[in-house]
A protein has these predicted regions:
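Conserved PLP-anchoring active-site segment centered on the Schiff-base-forming lysine
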Residues: 76-134
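Hydrophobic alpha-helical segments that mediate membrane insertion or helix-helix packing
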Residues: 48, 74, 90-93, 104, ...
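Aromatic/hydrophobic pocket-lining residues that form π-stacking "cages" and hydrophobic walls in ligand
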Residues: 100, 161, 225
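Active-site C-terminal subdomain of aminotransferase-like
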Residues: 220-233
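Structural detector of well-ordered beta-strand residues that form the stable sheet scaffold
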Residues: 66, 91, 112, 171-173, ...
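Conserved PLP-binding active-site segment in aminotransferase class I/II-type PLP enzymes
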Residues: 1-81, 85, 129, 148, ...
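Active-site phosphate-binding strand-loop segment of PLP-dependent enzymes
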Residues: 119-208, 213-222
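Residue-level signal for well-ordered alpha-helical positions
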Residues: 81, 183, 225-228
Length: 233
């Protein structure tokens, strides 16, 4: 007799029994805020900022958040804000969704894929450092950025990756699209690097059906990203 196989969904969106989602959709139409700006978006950014800035031990981080059209856009603008451009190289995790690497090529740069370690399935720190040294020897310059990923809510080796990044002066754009809500040593994933990427696609921990956000280290970085995202308005 064949066994019955039950589908286990990686992530399934849940609508509240109180229909709160419909309330806010109606509110947007009633107030004519149907553009991707306005009080609901501002409030969402503020709540995200409050969440990512609070460590589990009660201490605070100084973070800013920009809501964007997609997680891919967050990777794109994070790399752009790091100065990535034609002729540059960016170290990126090989085991990931293509949105982690496509923005690198959008900017005319070249991805340098780094394989994963067995424990976390995420970027192997030792292979990362070897790649950085190798690219410096072959091209005369270091990679312009590093993009580690938090797959399936699992943190990459944040301590070691950040140690290597700081050693060589390379900014980190942390792809926490699948890691929102998870913490490493009490700190929210996406808050370790210069920028952190969030996604609110339909298969993520919280969803707006589509959309994303970029966690920034300071108001200046947020202003720069907002300038890119809103056509310099």
């Amino acid at each position: 007799m064949d066994k019955e196989h039950k589908m286990i969904y990686l992530c399934l969106a849940h609508m509240s029994e109180e229909c709160m989602e419909q309330k806010y959709v109606k509110e947007a139409f009633d107030t004519n805020w149907v553009v991707p700006l306005g009080p609901n978006v501002n409030g969402f950014e503020d709540e995200l900022k409050a969440f990512v800035s609070k460590n589990s031990d009660g201490t605070d981080l100084q973070k800013e958040v920009v809501a964007l059209s997609a997680g891919t856009a967050a990777v794109h603008l994070g790399l752009l804000a790091c100065g990535v451009g034609p002729g540059d190289e960016v170290c990126v995790q090989s085991f990931t969704f293509c949105a982690s690497s496509h923005p690198i090529t959008y900017l005319g740069a070249t991805p340098v894929f780094i394989d994963s370690e067995a424990d976390s399935w995420n970027m192997d720190p030792e292979l990362l450092e070897k790649a950085i040294i190798d690219r410096k020897e072959k091209t005369g310059k270091y990679p312009k950025a590093i993009v580690p990923v938090d797959l399936y809510g699992m943190p990459y080796n944040c301590d070691r990756i950040m140690e290597i990044a700081n050693k060589y002066g390379i900014p980190v754009v942390e792809d926490a699209a699948e890691g929102f809500g998870s913490r490493y040593k009490g700190q929210v994933l996406g808050t370790f690097g210069k920028f952190g990427v969030l996604s609110f696609n339909g298969n993520k921990m919280i969803t707006t059906s589509g959309g994303g956000a970029l966690i920034c280290n300071d108001a200046e970085s947020k202003t720069q990203v907002m300038w890119y995202a809103t056509q310099a308005r």
